[in-house]
């Protein structure tokens, strides 16, 4: 079968679209990446997404409208990746869309129950492409008592499991998440969780203080020095010491967090500040490794994927902290760092169509293994 996987993460750096060929399912899955693109998200749409994520700025009409706007944008990404590959869209068997997370409540509090909201209307994607769409992957895991995240460990287990190495896969998108795959393990031995901020705070600082979308190659951070007092304060965030399973997002480390931090440390040199928040991401990864992974598994190799894999300063900090572990990017290991999550949803969508379980309960904390995703049929019929 041929599929397009779509991913728009918390970093808002674009819509990732991967065209892939997939066959089999479970341990017999074979997947081949054909083409990959990242479709830029306009500043206006980014601003609308950020507003939707902030209680004081959001509104029901904004969320309602943005749900459909993103549906059209995701459709454009599907058409673009197929066009780049000279692939006729009529030959697509399905589209797997993660959507755009607007809010994520992994654990109930006050009068709010565990819940999550991803938008990017699948009916619009299905209509615009006349293709079956699998979407809304996280909600069934939450219904089963899980946190709805992380979901990529299932695909990582299928693609990366090794008989001879204990592997850790650290994705650094807006938020960081890590998957541990012990050597010669089965799916129930895999565990994963969000490590905390990834690129989200770094990008926010870069946009505010340097008028750049992101810190390309970690250039600005490389010019600064770590402010130890500030770093100690950042590392005191209660999320870091929370034991897995755990997940987080923009609602914790987004614009409100950034505003408060920049106001508190406005006296810090901007180069030192971006160096410090870059080290914060690295040290959050190290803290989680030391406290929640090392007691269970001695990791041989850490593979870094996502946009953070291109930040040379961040990679350098991680290597300094994890001296006993081989640290590589996923590209160095033979896989695309950028296409990883979009490809994961192709695999998850395929499992949905095969009526197969694809949540990893040791990662999400769900009570049961469940079939993930909602299916929106082709609007004009046919297989």
Curated annotation (Swiss-Prot):
GO biological process, one term: amino sugar metabolic process
Top-level EC class: transferase
Entry's EC annotation: 2.7.1.170
GO molecular function list: ATP binding; kinase activity; phosphotransferase activity, alcohol group as acceptor
Keywords, comma-separated and alphabetical: ATP-binding, Carbohydrate metabolism, Kinase, Nucleotide-binding, Transferase
Catalytic reactions on record: 1,6-anhydro-N-acetyl-beta-muramate + ATP + H2O = N-acetyl-D-muramate 6-phosphate + ADP + H(+)
Pathway stated in the Swiss-Prot or TrEMBL entry: Amino-sugar metabolism; 1,6-anhydro-N-acetylmuramate degradation; Cell wall biogenesis; peptidoglycan recycling
Positions that bind ATP: 9-16
Cross-referenced HAMAP family: AnhMurNAc_kinase (MF_01270)
Function (record text): Catalyzes the specific phosphorylation of 1,6-anhydro-N-acetylmuramic acid (anhMurNAc) with the simultaneous cleavage of the 1,6-anhydro ring, generating MurNAc-6-P. Is required for the utilization of anhMurNAc either imported from the medium or derived from its own cell wall murein, and thus plays a role in cell wall recycling.
PANTHER family listed in its UniProt record: ANHYDRO-N-ACETYLMURAMIC ACID KINASE (PTHR30605:SF0)
Family the entry assigns: Belongs to the anhydro-N-acetylmuramic acid kinase family.
Protein name: Anhydro-N-acetylmuramic acid kinase
Organism this protein belongs to: Clostridioides difficile (strain 630) (Peptoclostridium difficile)
């Amino acid at each position: 079968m041929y599929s397009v996987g779509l991913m728009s993460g918390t970093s808002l750096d674009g819509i990732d679209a991967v065209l892939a060929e997939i066959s089999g399912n479970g341990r017999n899955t074979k997947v081949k990446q054909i083409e990959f693109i990242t479709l830029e998200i306009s500043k206006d749409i980014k601003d609308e997404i950020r507003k939707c994520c902030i209680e004081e700025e959001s509104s029901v009409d904004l969320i309602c409208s943005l749900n459909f706007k993103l549906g059209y944008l995701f459709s454009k990404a599907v058409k673009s990746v197929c066009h780049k590959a000279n692939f006729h869209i009529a030959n697509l068997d399905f589209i797997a869309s993660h959507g755009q997370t607007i809010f994520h409540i992994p654990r109930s509090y006050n009068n709010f129950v565990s819940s999550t909201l991803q938008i990017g209307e699948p009916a619009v994607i299905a209509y615009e492409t006349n293709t079956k769409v699998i979407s809304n992957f996280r909600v069934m895991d939450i219904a089963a008592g899980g946190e709805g995240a992380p979901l990529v460990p299932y695909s990582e287990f299928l693609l990366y499991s090794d008989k001879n190495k204990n592997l850790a896969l650290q994705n650094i998108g807006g938020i960081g998440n890590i998957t541990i795959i012990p050597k010669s393990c089965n799916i129930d031995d895999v565990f994963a969780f969000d490590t905390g901020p990834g690129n989200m705070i770094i990008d926010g600082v870069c946009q505010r203080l340097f008028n750049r979308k992101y810190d390309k190659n970690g250039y600005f951070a490389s010019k600064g020095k770590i402010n130890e007092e500030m770093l100690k304060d950042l590392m005191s965030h209660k999320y870091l010491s929370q034991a897995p399973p755990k997940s987080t997002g923009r609602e914790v480390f987004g614009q409100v967090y950034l505003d408060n931090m920049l106001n508190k440390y406005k006296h810090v040199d901007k180069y030192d500040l971006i160096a410090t928040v870059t080290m914060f991401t690295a040290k959050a990864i190290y803290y989680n490794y030391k406290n929640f992974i090392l007691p269970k598994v001695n990791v041989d190799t850490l593979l870094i994927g996502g946009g953070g894999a291109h930040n040379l300063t961040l990679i350098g900090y991680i290597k300094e902290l994890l001296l006993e572990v081989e640290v590589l990017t996923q590209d160095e290991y033979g896989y695309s760092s950028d296409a990883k999550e979009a490809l994961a949803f192709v695999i998850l969508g395929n499992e949905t169509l095969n009526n197969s379980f694809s949540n990893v309960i040791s990662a999400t904390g769900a009570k049961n293994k469940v079939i993930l995703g909602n299916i929106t049929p082709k609007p004009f019929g046919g297989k």
